[in-house]
């Protein structure tokens, strides 16, 4: 089950890489009738479910969790929800790459924490260390670090042109 769990944990990252590097292809594939950010969100939710199932397949759940669980999970999820609240679906799911005009956000956590959604996700993963073997948490976290690096090299000329 270890190899399948590792594959499941890594499953979304090739998809995200492909979208980031082939934004116009994704916009064309979605066509005029479907919003590329919404379609990306739906696919991402399915892939996230596969990731979580992969973690559960190797987890040893126990109660109560260690004390470090609560602040890491709470602040990590706060960051995730706050990013979504400020950016919305289009801002969270590569809307800028897909040719949408997304306003620049400077409210917390932006301007204070670099890549707050990824930081929040990594914090949430670290909260689960008492239940999930370290190598799976590390693998998933390295996927986020890879995406942070990839997205830091954004070239405005590589953005998709809207087909609407």
UniProtKB/Swiss-Prot annotation:
| Coiled coil feature spans | none
GO cellular component term, pick one = intracellular membrane-bounded organelle
Name the pathway. Answer: Phospholipid metabolism; phosphatidylcholine biosynthesis
Residue intervals on the Lumenal side: 22-30, 91-131
Q: Name one GO biological process term.
A: phosphatidylcholine biosynthetic process
Q: Give the phenotype of cells or organisms lacking this gene.
A: No visible phenotype under normal growth conditions.
Task: For this UniProt record, give its keywords in alphabetical order, as a comma-separated list.
Answer: Endoplasmic reticulum, Lipid biosynthesis, Lipid metabolism, Membrane, Methyltransferase, Phospholipid biosynthesis, Phospholipid metabolism, S-adenosyl-L-methionine, Transferase, Transmembrane, Transmembrane helix
| Positions with a binding annotation for S-adenosyl-L-methionine | 74-76, 154-155
Please indicate if the UniProt record lists Methyltransferase as a keyword.
yes
- Which regions does the annotation call intramembrane? 1-21
The enzyme's E.C. designation: 2.1.1.71
Looking up InterPro entries in the UniProt record yields: PEMT/MFAP, Phopholipid_MeTrfase
TM ranges are 31-52, 70-90, 132-151
Catalysed reactions, semicolon-separated: a 1,2-diacyl-sn-glycero-3-phospho-N-methylethanolamine + S-adenosyl-L-methionine = a 1,2-diacyl-sn-glycero-3-phospho-N,N-dimethylethanolamine + S-adenosyl-L-homocysteine + H(+); a 1,2-diacyl-sn-glycero-3-phospho-N,N-dimethylethanolamine + S-adenosyl-L-methionine = a 1,2-diacyl-sn-glycero-3-phosphocholine + S-adenosyl-L-homocysteine + H(+)
**Which coarse location class applies to the principal site listed for this UniProt protein?**
endoplasmic reticulum
List residues in topological domain: Cytoplasmic: 53-69, 152-164
According to the UniProt entry, its GO molecular function terms are: phosphatidyl-N-methylethanolamine N-methyltransferase activity; phosphatidylethanolamine N-methyltransferase activity
What family is this protein classified in? Answer: Belongs to the class VI-like SAM-binding methyltransferase superfamily. PEMT/PEM2 methyltransferase family.
Q: Which PANTHER family match?
A: PHOSPHATIDYLETHANOLAMINE N-METHYLTRANSFERASE
Q: Tell me the function of this protein.
A: Catalyzes the second two steps of the methylation pathway of phosphatidylcholine biosynthesis, the SAM-dependent methylation of phosphatidylmonomethylethanolamine (PMME) to phosphatidyldimethylethanolamine (PDME) and of PDME to phosphatidylcholine (PC).
Name the record gives this protein: Phosphatidyl-N-methylethanolamine N-methyltransferase
Native species: Arabidopsis thaliana
């Amino acid at each position: 089950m270890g190899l399948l769990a590792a594959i499941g944990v890594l499953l979304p990252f090739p998809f995200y890489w492909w979208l980031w590097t082939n934004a116009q292809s994704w916009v064309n594939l979605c066509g005029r009738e479907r919003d590329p950010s919404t379609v990306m969100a739906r696919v991402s939710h399915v892939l996230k479910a596969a990731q979580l199932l992969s973690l559960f397949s190797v987890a040893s759940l126990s109660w109560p969790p260690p004390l470090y669980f609560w602040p890491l999970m709470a602040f990590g999820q706060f960051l995730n929800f706050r990013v979504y609240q400020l950016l919305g679906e289009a801002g969270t799911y590569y809307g800028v790459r897909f040719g949408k005009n997304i306003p620049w956000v400077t409210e917390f956590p932006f301007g204070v924490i670099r890549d707050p959604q990824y930081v929040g996700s990594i914090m949430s993963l670290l909260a689960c260390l008492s239940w999930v073997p370290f190598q799976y948490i590390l693998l998933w976290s390295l996927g986020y670090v890879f995406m942070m690096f990839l997205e830091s090299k954004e070239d405005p000329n590589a953005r998709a042109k809207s087909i609407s």
